[in-house]
Each structure stands twice: as C-alpha cells, then as structure tokens.
C-alpha cells in the first residue's frame, strides 16, 4: 500500500518499517513503539525528470514565468528548483494576482504592533503591556477532497501561525460555506422539508453568470453536501478539542454556488506580552537551524500549488495526496515546547512549516532577515522511504517548525525538545549569501536567491470588466411580487425563514466543539459575538523588557487586570454576488455591528478573500470590488487589516462560487458589566429599534438579495441593501455608548431575515442549561412604520414620491444599520433621547413578556407560539443531517 493510501490514523502516526530506515538525530523515548518515531531512509539514487514544456505547464508556471525563473538562476533549473518556484510563485503563497489590491487596505493604527504582511499574523496592543495575535486562513480545496483532514489541518495551521508569533492560542473561530443540505432548502417539523417557492433556472456554468437561488438541489448533491458538512465540522471539532482550544464563534451559510467547492476558513487568536513578539527571521550568520516536529512524509505534497488551481473532479482525485494529515496531540506538544523555548531567549527566529512546507519556511526566514540559509535534506527526519529532494522540500506534513537558535545555546534547546519528547534535528545554518542552498546526498539540488522566491514573484494587473448579468440584477423591482399579508402568509414566511439552515440555530455544529476549555469563555456561540476573558494564565511565560528572541534577564509579570475580547466573523455571499462593493462594506459593517451589540468597539480585522479565478475579467472585477468594499468598511470603523489570506480559483465544473470576502473583527470590551447578549431578559422590558425600520430610498426596501426573497420567492436577485458607512459607524458608537452608560439589557442586530427573524431570535435563543431553552415572548407594534400610503415629496423635492412601505419589507427586509435593544421601562425615554441626539433614529416598538411573539402592523397582526418557533429554529439542521 502506498503512503497516500494508508488509513488516516496510520498516516498521522507515520510508523515506517524500521528495517528499511535508519535513525535521525533524536528518537522519542518510547522508541520503536512511538507513533512519532523519527527515522530516515538510506540514500537512493533518483533520476530527476527532464524539464519540458509539459512539465512546466504541469507546475502551473507560464512560459513568461519560466523565462524569468531562468533569468534569476542564470541557468536551467533542477527539478527540485522547478517545484520550489512552482509553489512559491503560486497564488496561495505569492498573491501575484491580488497584491496590488491588498495594498488598498487600511493597515495603520497606534495599536498595531505587527502589521499586515510583516509576519505570520498581525499583533494588536490591548493595553497593560498585553497584545493579541490573530489571523484567518482558508483550507478550501483540501476540505473539498478530504473534508475531515482538510478542515482539521486548517485549524492546526492557523494555530501554528499564532504560537509562532510567541502568543499562546486561546480561542478559535470558523466561517463555513456548503451547498444546500435539504432538497427544498428548508427543513420543517419532524424532519419534513418546507414548501418551496418558485425555483430559479439551473446554474449557468459560464464564468460570471446570474447568481442562482440555493433552495433547488438534487438528492445526490444534497447527500454530498451533507457529507462535506459533517466531515468538516467533525475535523474542526477533533483538532480543536484535542489540542485544547475553545471554538467560541463562527458562521455557516448554505448556497448552491458552494456545491462541490465548500469554504473552510479558520481563525485563531492568541495572547502575549509586547516583549514576547517573535519574528520569523533567520537572523545571525552562523546560527544553527533546527527542524522540530514529526517526520516528513508525502502527505500534503505541493498543497499550495493545488490550492491555486480550479477544483475539478480530475484535479481533486489527482491531488488527494496533497491533503495534509494532522495530529493535534503532537501540535500541543510542539506548542508548549516552543513557548517554553521562547522564554529562554535562545531563539533567534521561528517559522512554522505551513504552505509549501520546508521550502517556504527556509526562504521566507532568510528573506525577512536579509541573510541566507543552507540546509541538508539528509538530516531531515523522513517517515516515507526513498523520498526525493523535490518531495522533502514540497511536503506539507503537519506540526513541523523551523527554529533558528543562537549559536552556543544548542544544548538548552535540545533539552527542552527532549523534555517534551519531540523529534528534532539540526539541519542547517544561517549564512551571509542571501541564498537558499539545499543539499541532498552530498549534491546541491537547489541554489536560489531567497528574496527572489519569497518576495519577488511576478505581479499581475488583471483586467476587470463588470459582468453583464448585473444589468438584470439592478433592473429587478418588486412590482408583480406578491406582498405577504398578516395571518397565514406572514406566519408561514417566518417559520420557513427560521427553518432555513442558513438562519437556523447552528447548535448541531457548535455542540460538537468544546467552547469552554481553558475557562475563559464569557459569551459562547449563540449570540451576536463571542466574548473571551484574557486571564493571567493565558499569557505565555516570558521576561519583560526583552524580545522573546533575545536573552532573558528577569522574572515574568502577571497582567494587572483581565481583558475582555469580542470576536465576530461575517460575510453574505449573496450580497457580494449581486453587488460586490456593497457586499464587502456590509460584511465589515455586520461584523462590527455584532461587536457593538456585545459592548465592544473594533481593534482590528483580518480578512479571507474566497474568490473564483482572477483570470476571467468578469470574475476579477468581483474580486476588485469586494476588496474596495472591505477597505472602505475597515476605514469607516477604525478596524485596520492586520493580515489575512487570499483563496482564489474557488470554482467547480458547475461554476464559480459567489465571491465571499469573509472578515473577522476583534474588539475590546472595557468592563465586564458592559458585556451584552442578544436574548430578551425580563418581562415588562421595553423594546427599542435603533436605526430606520425600512430604507425607503431603496427601491427594493431592503429585500434585494434577502433571505426572504430566496426562501419564499425562490429568487436571488436585486441590488442588496445599501450600506451607508457613516450611518453605520454612528450607530455603533452610539450603541456602545448607551451600553457603557448603563440601562441596555440586550442588543441584537437585524441581518439575515430582517426584523422579524431578529425579534424571534431574541425570544428563543437563550439557553439556561445545555438542553433547556428559556423562551420569553414579546408584543411588537410596527403600525407606525407601514404598510402605508406613498409619502409625498418633501418641500423643494423634485423627485417622485417614495413608494409605500411593504409589509414583507418591514418584517423581512434587510435594511442595514438596525439593532433591537431592550431596557427597563424607566430607561426607555433616556435611551431614545440619547440615540436621537447622536443622529440615530430610535423608536419604542414593543414590550417583552408572555409565551408568544406578536407582530402588529397597520393591516393587522400575526402571532407565533414560541415552542413551535424554537423547535423549527433549533432542530432544522439536526433533522436535515439525520
């Protein structure tokens, strides 16, 4: 059986045949019985293939790129060098198609300690000498091929990025996308599926076709989507739970555009002191270079290159071996050993072997330091027999680190590695040549300028052309679309929306995660944003006044006070498909609105651009406009981008995904009493709506691209709701000010499904125990807002009168910048007056209490018993998956 065909457990353990191998520099104490045995095979003569045009094309290098490669080398490349250039000049590693766009992001702030593009993760000051390191990355293609391992190693990779910076990982978040998991898109009571609205046409496979509505899905596709969904969630749970990091927040969307190409974005946040920041730089000529972690195998071979090409059935099968295999228990040992090692001051630089493995870690550390690096592959622990230099350099076997040690302190380092029973080997040295030199069996197999492959890849200015389908999107109007009426229509619409898997409770997902480990979780999954407490034991051991890469000289300091950090991750792919600029703005606005609802203002952000091919002008336009929207949003909310990830070529034979520029925003809650959750608290509390009930300047009144339009009418079209960034920023600062002033008991933003869904969630989303919800009703009167007759033009206006407010727009429209808050009756007038004084519309709309949700409007009222709503919302996904 080949290595790539082994069962996952065997691949993770990597137990080779001892008779065929010889020992490396260090073997764990349990020797041959260890599942982490570190050994190397005897040298075997290998004939490298000739470099032909076909081989160059197979490595995804253009003729122009290959010519540039030869100019850099001044000769023909070796096969190993060809592989090195292939992965380092792939989009996944080089961002050659997106780097000009990324420069438009706001990246500066007085709080930024390590900025975008500098290191493995950004670092932001949170006061009292403490800082947080955070980042989001994708593992989309691997998860499409092997969902469990693809998702698991996505978590492992982002966790390594954090502790590589010298920070202790304290929480994880994820953002997931899949095709529909129900044939009709909606799961009803007792496992039945809801009634379907009018379906949109079958997907157009052209590069930039009209977005299609998600409810329609074939049974075979539904089963595949469920398999991918279950595998990804299981992989995330396995790695995070075993490592011991709480997964405290996330989002999951289901849409037809993600069939065959799921999105798996993993975020991690860690804590450190300012002086503990570690750099991934090969500093100090003559310093030894250590390899730490399990032996190198053929798993994950050229995974970075695989992630930089279209996902097809053929490529998925051919690249199954490019999916890495993770071992969270090994990662935990590596993490603890690295943090202990950093506290000694013996480390000059540290880098994880993530994308492109040993290749990326060596050339990037040398390039950052302006030095060179020389390694000997014979010293690299290997678990597969007869590995070539090409395979060793391009392998993405997990849980491996490259550590540059101050010369003369090798014994300290070895002692710590041995204490944690970790495999290690001294494989090279820092040089002054500026080149990455790789030797194998006594011969030089690669000799390349480090900066040329790490930082000087080709950069492309792609053509951007607006897709033709947007003309139809913008022309869509509500005339001819039946409005809901009170009674059966409104009742049925809300029930279907709450049962739609995209809106329904994600408890089937987060109950598989340990979100309480480390005892720092303050607000767990189920509210607008998660909140985590930074405790004293969250900070790694370290010495004040010195860098983690410099010698120590004093004892550690405990933090003077605990910090509360809020986190949210967001993106509405439908909005971005219909208007990528507005969709990009809305993604940042919702993430920041979720923080505000939790009592926090932003500190910084990290983005993950999940996009289709940049080679099609219509698709590159989507990328460009999405980035423009994100950039403007981050500027408006003072949420500088500290780093992130670009994942392009997300398209299957069925067509491209909806552009999905996911953004995670991190904020600071000043005091514990400011932490706010979304569920209603007490009978008799007053419900206040902050923000305009309906954007009457929008011809679609907030229904364009809405969940209501997709689920009830089977249409994914129309310009999405406008996001006025000034209005949104004013709302957020006003809301946080009201929370800090006292009196606000709950706050919940209005997003997918509109005001009616938001109010229902406030009634049914609180858990007082694991399986015990607390249901609390509300009576809401919206008769002052519509439906109503057309309002005349204001004096001096020449524009036509604005249209009447529709009932479906009032209940289910997704007009931006709205939050439902509650307070005691005595505080209501004060909150409304303060909000209006700040320029935020505010109105009393109802009262908390009872066992039903009642919504009144001018045309009548609709009532929903809460147990039925909770059953639909809570059990929709579990019924679909069972």
Question: Which residue ranges define each predicted feature?
Answer:
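Glycine/proline-enriched, intrinsically flexible loops and inter-domain linkers
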Residues: 45-188, 219-539, 562-792, 797, ...
């Amino acid at each position: 059986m080949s290595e790539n065909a082994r069962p996952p457990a065997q691949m993770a353990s990597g137990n080779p045949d001892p008779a065929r191998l010889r020992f490396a520099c260090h073997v764990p104490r349990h020797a041959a019985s260890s599942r982490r045995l570190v050994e190397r095979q005897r040298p075997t003569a290998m004939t490298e293939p000739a470099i032909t045009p076909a081989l160059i094309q197979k490595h995804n290098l253009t003729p122009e790129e290959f010519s540039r490669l030869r100019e850099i080398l001044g000769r023909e490349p070796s096969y190993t060098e060809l592989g090195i250039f292939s992965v380092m000049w792939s989009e996944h590693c080089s961002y050659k198609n997106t780097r000009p766009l990324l420069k438009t992001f706001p990246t500066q702030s007085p709080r930024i300690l390590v900025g975008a593009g500098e290191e493995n993760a950004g670092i932001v000051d949170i006061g009292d000498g403490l800082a947080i390191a955070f980042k989001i990355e994708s593992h989309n293609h691997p998860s499409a091929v092997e969902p469990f391992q693809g998702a698991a190693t996505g978590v492992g990779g982002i966790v390594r990025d954090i502790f590589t910076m010298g920070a202790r990982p304290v929480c994880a978040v994820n953002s997931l996308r899949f095709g529909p998991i129900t044939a009709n898109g909606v799961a009803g009571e007792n496992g039945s599926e809801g009634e379907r609205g009018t379906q949109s046409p079958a997907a157009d496979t052209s590069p930039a076709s009209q977005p299609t509505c998600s409810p329609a899905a074939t049974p075979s596709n539904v089963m595949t989507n469920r398999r991918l969904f279950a595998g990804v969630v299981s992989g995330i749970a396995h790695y995070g739970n075993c490592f011991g990091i709480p997964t405290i927040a996330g989002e999951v969307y289901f849409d037809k555009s993600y069939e065959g190409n799921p999105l798996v974005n993993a975020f991690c946040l860690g804590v450190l002191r300012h002086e503990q920041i570690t750099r991934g730089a090969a500093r100090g000529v003559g310093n030894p270079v250590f390899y730490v972690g399990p032996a190198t195998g053929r798993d994950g071979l050229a995974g970075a290159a695989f992630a930089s090409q279209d996902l097809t059935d053929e490529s998925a099968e051919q690249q199954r071996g490019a999916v890495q295999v993770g071992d969270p228990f090994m990662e935990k040992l590596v993490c603890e050993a690295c943090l202990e090692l950093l506290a000694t001051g013996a480390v000059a630089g540290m880098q994880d072997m993530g994308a492109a493995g040993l290749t990326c870690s060596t050339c990037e550390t040398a390039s950052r330091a302006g030095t060179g690096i020389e390694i000997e592959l014979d010293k690299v622990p290997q678990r597969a027999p007869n590995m070539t230099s090409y395979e060793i350099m391009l392998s993405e076997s997990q849980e491996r680190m490259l550590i540059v040690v101050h010369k003369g302190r090798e014994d300290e380092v070895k002692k710590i590695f041995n204490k944690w029973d970790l495999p290690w080997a001294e494989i090279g040295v820092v040089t002054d040549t500026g080149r990455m030199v790789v030797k194998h069996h006594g011969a030089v197999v690669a000799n390349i300028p480090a900066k040329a492959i790490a930082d000087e890849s080709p950069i492309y200015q792609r053509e951007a052309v607006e897709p033709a389908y947007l003309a139809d999107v913008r022309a869509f109007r509500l005339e001819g679309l039946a409005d809901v009426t009170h009674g059966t229509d409104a009742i049925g619409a809300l029930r279907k929306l709450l049962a739609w898997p995209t809106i329904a409770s994600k408890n089937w997902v987060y109950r598989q995660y340990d979100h309480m480990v480390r005892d720092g979780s303050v607000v767990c999954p189920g509210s607008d944003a998660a909140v985590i407490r930074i405790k004293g034991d969250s900070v790694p051991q370290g010495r004040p006044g010195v860098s983690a890469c410099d010698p120590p000289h004093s004892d550690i300091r405990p933090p003077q006070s605990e910090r509360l950090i809020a986190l949210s991750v967001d993106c509405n792919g439908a909005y971005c498909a219909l208007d990528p600029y507005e969709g990009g703005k809305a993604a940042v606005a919702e993430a920041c609105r979720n923080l505000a609802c939790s009592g926090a203002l932003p500190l910084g952000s990290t983005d993950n651009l999940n996009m289709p091919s940049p080679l099609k002008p219509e698709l590159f336009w989507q990328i460009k406009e999405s980035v423009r929207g994100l950039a403007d949003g981050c500027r408006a909310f003072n949420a500088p981008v500290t780093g992130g990830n670009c994942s392009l070529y997300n398209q299957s034979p069925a067509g491209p995904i909806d552009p999905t520029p996911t953004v995670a925003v991190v904020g600071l809650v000043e005091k514990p009493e400011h932490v706010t959750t979304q569920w209603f608290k007490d009978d008799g509390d007053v419900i206040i709506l902050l923000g305009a009930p309906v954007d009457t300047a929008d011809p679609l009144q907030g229904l364009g691209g809405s969940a209501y339009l997709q689920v009830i009418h089977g249409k994914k079209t129309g310009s999405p709701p406008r996001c006025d960034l000034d209005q949104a920023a004013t709302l957020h600062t006003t809301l946080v000010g009201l929370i800090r002033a006292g009196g606000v008991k709950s706050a919940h933003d209005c997003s997918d499904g509109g005001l009616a869904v938001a109010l229902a969630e406030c009634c049914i989303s609180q858990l007082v125990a694991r399986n015990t919800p607390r249901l609390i009703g509300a009576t809401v009167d919206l008769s002052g807002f519509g439906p109503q007759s057309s309002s005349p033009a204001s004096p001096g206006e020449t524009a036509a009168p604005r249209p009447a407010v529709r009932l479906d727009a009032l209940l289910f429209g997704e007009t931006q910048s709205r939050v439902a808050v509650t307070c005691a009756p005595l505080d209501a007038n004060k909150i409304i007056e303060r909000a209006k004084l700040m320029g935020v519309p505010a109105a009393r709309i109802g009262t908390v209490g009872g066992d039903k949700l009642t919504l009144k409007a001018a045309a009548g009222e609709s009532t929903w018993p809460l147990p039925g709503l909770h059953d639909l919302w809570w059990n929709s996904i579990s019924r679909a998956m069972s």
